[in-house]
């Protein structure tokens, strides 16, 4: 008897190709499932989720597979969006994609998969592992690898997950879609955070977190060099949006004092204070047993390079991460993912002092 695989379909080319490949294999009963988390409208006033669902319908009809839709909008706002706002208001820089994977896609969506009597869940993530029992590894396309975004998802939640695109390059996925005549073959990839869309980040955030004007201070001179509209708008290492003129070198956000509502900057992209030798990480998730110390590499942002480091477990359940070479713009609230080669060991949330000591 053939097993059933539920394909998480977003209306994009990646999940369309996943459904196509699984149907073509002939080994599974393939069922599409569209998940609505946010009701954002585009510049024409049309809900983008409605347009995406229309594309899911077209692909499902092309492939002759049944499809369903489920809305997690309420749960998304409670478990992802509200935390996102709370963290930003407190000066942190959270990663909502990591939260969404843990709280929605591989928790609530998995419950729906079981309701539909699915044996497997398949997604369009560019990573490897899951149902093959190996935990989680990078996808082979270095420009598309998404293991970073899944580093906070428990191993058990991935135990029935198929990642058909993990061994493919994006160009190959596009080619397959075009050769198969899939309706989404030329559809642009979605970028950015789903609930922000194409809007500038500041204009989005100010709808939910009130402006709070304060001083921008040069950390080295302790002189006021400008004004800001809210310390929560700025993240460590940020250059754009400071609106400070008359400086020989570009200015970068060094740290923030949320209590006093001060943003500290330094001048020059290689200013030594922008670099940290160590960090603490909390809310940890591991795919492998934690050894002491664990010699590995870490990514402190999605697009940052791998940094060699040693990881030491602490009694309170956090870990101390010591880098071989100081790392630039380590940001409290961001996700850190740990690797040995292509294998993702796990991940956590960065916890470093928000205020530099004088």
UniProtKB/Swiss-Prot annotation:
Major localisation: cytoplasm
Q: Where is the protein found, in the record's own terms?
A: Cytoplasm
Q: Which GO terms describe its molecular function?
A: ATP binding; tRNA binding; tRNA-uridine 2-sulfurtransferase activity
Q: Report which reactions are catalysed by this protein.
A: S-sulfanyl-L-cysteinyl-[protein] + uridine(34) in tRNA + AH2 + ATP = 2-thiouridine(34) in tRNA + L-cysteinyl-[protein] + A + AMP + diphosphate + H(+)
Domain of life of the native organism: Bacteria
Q: Which CDD domains match?
A: MnmA_TRMU-like (cd01998)
Which residues does this entry assign to the site Interaction with tRNA?
Answer: 125, 334
UniProt keywords (A-Z) are:
ATP-binding, Cytoplasm, Disulfide bond, Nucleotide-binding, RNA-binding, Transferase, tRNA processing, tRNA-binding
Q: What is its EC number?
A: 2.8.1.13
Q: Where is this region: Interaction with tRNA?
A: 144-146, 301-302
SS bond partners:
100-194
In this chain, ATP is annotated as bound at 8-15, 35, 124
**PANTHER family attached to this UniProt entry:** MITOCHONDRIAL TRNA-SPECIFIC 2-THIOURIDYLASE 1, TRNA 5-METHYLAMINOMETHYL-2-THIOURIDYLATE -METHYLTRANSFERASE
Which family does the UniProt entry place this protein in?
Belongs to the MnmA/TRMU family.
| Chain's role | Catalyzes the 2-thiolation of uridine at the wobble position (U34) of tRNA, leading to the formation of s(2)U34.
Q: What is this protein called?
A: tRNA-specific 2-thiouridylase MnmA
Q: Which organism is it from?
A: Chlamydia trachomatis serovar D (strain ATCC VR-885 / DSM 19411 / UW-3/Cx)
Tell me what gene encodes this: mnmA
């Amino acid at each position: 008897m053939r097993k059933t695989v539920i394909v998480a379909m977003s209306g994009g080319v990646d999940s369309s190709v996943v459904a196509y490949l699984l149907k073509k294999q002939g080994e599974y009963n393939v069922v599409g499932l569209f998940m609505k988390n946010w009701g954002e409208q585009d510049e024409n006033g049309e809900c983008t989720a409605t347009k995406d669902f229309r594309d899911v319908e077209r692909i499902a009809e092309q492939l002759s597979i049944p499809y369903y839709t489920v809305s997690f909008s309420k749960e998304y706002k409670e478990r992802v969006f509200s935390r996102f706002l709370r963290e930003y208001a407190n000066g942190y820089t959270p990663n909502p994609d990591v939260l969404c994977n843990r709280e929605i896609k591989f928790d609530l969506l998995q419950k729906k998969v079981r309701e539909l009597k699915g044996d497997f869940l398949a997604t369009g993530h560019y990573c490897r592992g899951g149902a093959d029992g190996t935990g989680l590894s990078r996808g082979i396309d270095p420009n598309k690898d998404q293991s970073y975004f899944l580093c906070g998802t428990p191993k058990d939640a991935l135990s029935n997950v198929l990642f058909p695109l993990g061994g493919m390059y994006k160009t190959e996925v596009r080619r397959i879609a075009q050769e198969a005549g899939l309706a989404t073959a030329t559809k642009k990839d979605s970028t950015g955070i789903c609930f922000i869309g194409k809007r500038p980040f500041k204009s989005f955030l100010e709808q939910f977190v009130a402006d709070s004007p304060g001083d921008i201070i040069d950390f080295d001179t302790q002189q006021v060099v400008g004004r800001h509209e809210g310390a929560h708008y700025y993240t460590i290492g940020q250059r754009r949006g400071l609106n400070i003129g008359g400086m020989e070198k570009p200015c970068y956000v060094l740290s923030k004092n949320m209590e006093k509502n001060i943003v500290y900057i330094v001048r020059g992209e290689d200013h030594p204070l922008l670099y940290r030798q160590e960090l603490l990480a909390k809310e940890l998730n591991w795919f492998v047993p934690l050894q002491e110390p664990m010699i590995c590499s870490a990514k402190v942002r999605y697009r940052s390079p791998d940094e060699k480091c040693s990881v030491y477990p602490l009694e309170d359940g956090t870990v101390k991460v010591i880098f071989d070479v100081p790392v630039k713009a380590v940001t409290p609230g961001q996700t850190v993912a740990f690797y040995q080669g292509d294998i993702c060991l796990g991940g956590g949330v960065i916890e470093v002092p928000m205020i530099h000591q004088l």
